[in-house]
Amino acid sequence: MKAQEAVKLAWQHHTIVPAFNIPYLPMAKPVAQAIIDEKTVAMLQVARLEWEKFESRSLEAVAEEYFKYYDPKYTLLHLDHVPVIDEDHKRVDFMPILERAVKAGYQSVMVDGSRLSLEENIATTKQVAEFAHANGIACEAELGSVMGHEGSGANMDYEEIFRTKKGFTDLNEAKRFTAETGCDWLSVAVGSIHGAIADGVRNQKKPEARLDIQHIADLSKITGIPLVLHGGSGINNQCILDG
């Protein structure tokens, strides 16, 4: 099953396709085996920061491990966060990374332009969506600011952020963004927190996050495409079920 078909089917049935990151290469085998044992459709994924700052080695290394253990009925391979501006606020030459992913056999890719202006994010995402579709794979994009990668996840006043909806995906921007970019899935900011990766806070405990369920419903209605939740670990379980 193609990733695009799997996610669309899950969306239509009001369920999810879970995705598991591989920051350390030996995780690929047990994650793939667990997915197959459970007979559920799920993704293995790796983000750029996981070969830059952790031990997944490269997107090609993860793909090589994936294809040793995968089952096409259940497992999918996704390239997670490829930022245009990374967590250290440096510009990334992102297109060659996406091209490598296509060659390695990834079924979907994510471009993260969330640190760009809205206009730049739209233009960049449109470019990547066209590239992905020309190669027969799906494109995920991000709009809004999911906290945590820069270290804010451990020290933030979470209650204040949730109350004010700071960084949450704007409804009107989301409607325009999806219409103009052609992305297949949209990663949204609705209360979750990325794990912090900055030195000094990496090992601190995340706050227990929750989700703004009404905001999710509004975003789903206004965009008309599947939404993606990042920072899923540490969220109140009932919020996950409700979302």
Where are these regions (language model features)?
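Short acidic/histidine-rich active-site segments
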Residues: G231-I235
